[in-house]
Amino acid sequence: MKVLFAGGGTGGHLYPGVAMAAELKKRVPGISISFAGTSAGIEATEVPRLGYRLVLFPVRGLKRGLSIRALVENALILGDFAKSLSMAMALVRKEQPDVVVGTGGYVSAPLLLAAQLSGKKTLIQEQNAFPGVTTRLLARMATEVHLSFEESRKFFGGKSEVFVTGNPAREFPAESRESCLDFFGLDRSLPTLLVFGGSRGARAINNAVLKLCHRLEGTVNLIWQTGALDADRMRGEIGTSATRWIGPYIQEMGKAYGAADLVLCRAGASSLAELTNLGKPSVLIPYPYAAADHQRHNAMALVSAGASVMIDDSKIGEEASFDVILTLLRDREKLAQMGEAARREGHPGAAATLAERIIALSKS
């Protein structure tokens, strides 16, 4: 059995494919798995590190604007797409994959299109509540489309082969709240706020939490992933405390979630998959410059479900926003209700479910 994954650029587009690949290896001895990506994406280093074959394509995203420079650049980019499509057609003819799986990013388009034109089975896995243009166009000819949010279904008309299976996410062993708090050296009797803005941090969130710290002191535990760029500045400005853990990156993310009563973070698809799988209430601050504002759509899906509160990036540093966060932290009943709502939106085992669908398609 041969499977080709096409996706990357960011971890959000790569790691769902990696999770599916791992599940396929468990189920199909001797399976051949390859990835298609670009030299500029995270896959250029991660895929070889994980031991998978990587085929690189020159495809890039179009530039916005109508300037002469943008028009010239876009003409070159369209040329790269045509070259990538030709390369993809040749790869599909040579490799004869049983299924091509698209997980988003620029490289998905030429690979999925080449597979569809060659009569191969294709599966699209969409992470976000607001599907991208490529997904919406190629879904028409895809064998199956798998979504992370029920709200996304409306973008695919009457297509019957559309399923809500969730977004493959990291899985963490179950641990007691007390043992997780002990790991970070925090007070078991206090509510705990977990803050992160991605592996590199988020400046707006960090600056807001820096202002919020004086209101948390002595009444709320704080576990704060600042990202590497802000770690020293944040530590230097607020110093140490028995109720704070501050670091550039949280290696033991499962323990951080286990300790947390409330999570403050961006609204990326992977983070939301983890929050819902674990049943964690959240305050979401969508990244305002995400493509097609997709993080706001992601956040609204959880807000509508009663699992989250959304605060605009431009308002996160206001006292009124701090009031919302502190009010939630003091209301255990509300947090429990939000946590249950989050859990109802979760799809634990999404990677395994998708692996089974890929196997079924290869046999059909």
UniProtKB/Swiss-Prot annotation:
Taxonomic lineage: Bacteria, Pseudomonadati, Chlorobiota, Chlorobiia, Chlorobiales
For this UniProt entry, the molecular function terms from Gene Ontology, in alphabetical order, are:
UDP-N-acetyl-D-glucosamine:N-acetylmuramoyl-L-alanyl-D-glutamyl-meso-2,6-diaminopimelyl-D-alanyl-D-alanine-diphosphoundecaprenol 4-beta-N-acetylglucosaminlytransferase activity; undecaprenyldiphospho-muramoylpentapeptide beta-N-acetylglucosaminyltransferase activity
Gene3D superfamilies in the record, alphabetically? Answer: Glycogen Phosphorylase B
Q: In which pathway does it act?
A: Cell wall biogenesis; peptidoglycan biosynthesis
Entry's HAMAP family? MurG
Function, please? Answer: Cell wall formation. Catalyzes the transfer of a GlcNAc subunit on undecaprenyl-pyrophosphoryl-MurNAc-pentapeptide (lipid intermediate I) to form undecaprenyl-pyrophosphoryl-MurNAc-(pentapeptide)GlcNAc (lipid intermediate II).
Transmembrane stretches in the record are none
Q: Where is the signal peptide?
A: none
Q: Which family does it belong to?
A: Belongs to the glycosyltransferase 28 family. MurG subfamily.
Compartments it resides in: Cell inner membrane
Its GO CC terms are:
plasma membrane
- Protein name in the entry: UDP-N-acetylglucosamine--N-acetylmuramyl-(pentapeptide) pyrophosphoryl-undecaprenol N-acetylglucosamine transferase
Task: List the EC numbers from the record.
Answer: 2.4.1.227
